[in-house]
Amino acid sequence: MVLETISKIIKTQLPAYLKKFPLPETIGGFARLTVLDWLRLLPLLGILTLLGYLTIRPFLPKKKKQKDSLINLKIQKENPKVVNEIDIEDLKSTNVCYCRCWRSKTFPVCDKSHIKHNELTGDNVGPLILKKKII
């Protein structure tokens, strides 16, 4: 089914398209093309542009991976790591650590990804620790 469709396009529709194709013989002939002629040229120009891009793409400069940026810009910068502990009476478990660096694979729970982030960037972000308040 697919091969029959491709065969029909190549054997029937493509030759019919190329017969009606308004390709001028000189460069100055492009200036004399009508709007309808330009519209007929658009699919071919699009395909040629795509093929040209795909050809030169391996030679284009690669984008550099952006360096991890700081998260904590001004809070307690004098401390090596900012960790806040909050006592809550109604907490079901004894301790819960929440991520504030947005790098945790178990987000929102902290998996200590901030340690690697802090080493790479020089940041001082740490987790938010919720403790069960002992009455």
Curated annotation (Swiss-Prot):
Per the record's keyword annotation, is Iron-sulfur included, yes or no?
yes
**Single Gene Ontology MF annotation:** 2 iron, 2 sulfur cluster binding
Q: Which residues lie on this side of the membrane: Lumenal?
A: 1-37
Q: Taxonomically, which superkingdom?
A: Eukaryota
Q: Does the keyword Transcription regulation apply?
A: no
Where on this chain does [2Fe-2S] cluster bind?
C99, C101, C110, H114
Q: Which family does it belong to?
A: Belongs to the CISD protein family. CISD2 subfamily.
What's the protein called, per UniProt? CDGSH iron-sulfur domain-containing protein 2B
Per the UniProt entry, what species is this protein from, by scientific name? Oncorhynchus mykiss
Q: Which gene encodes it?
A: cisd2b
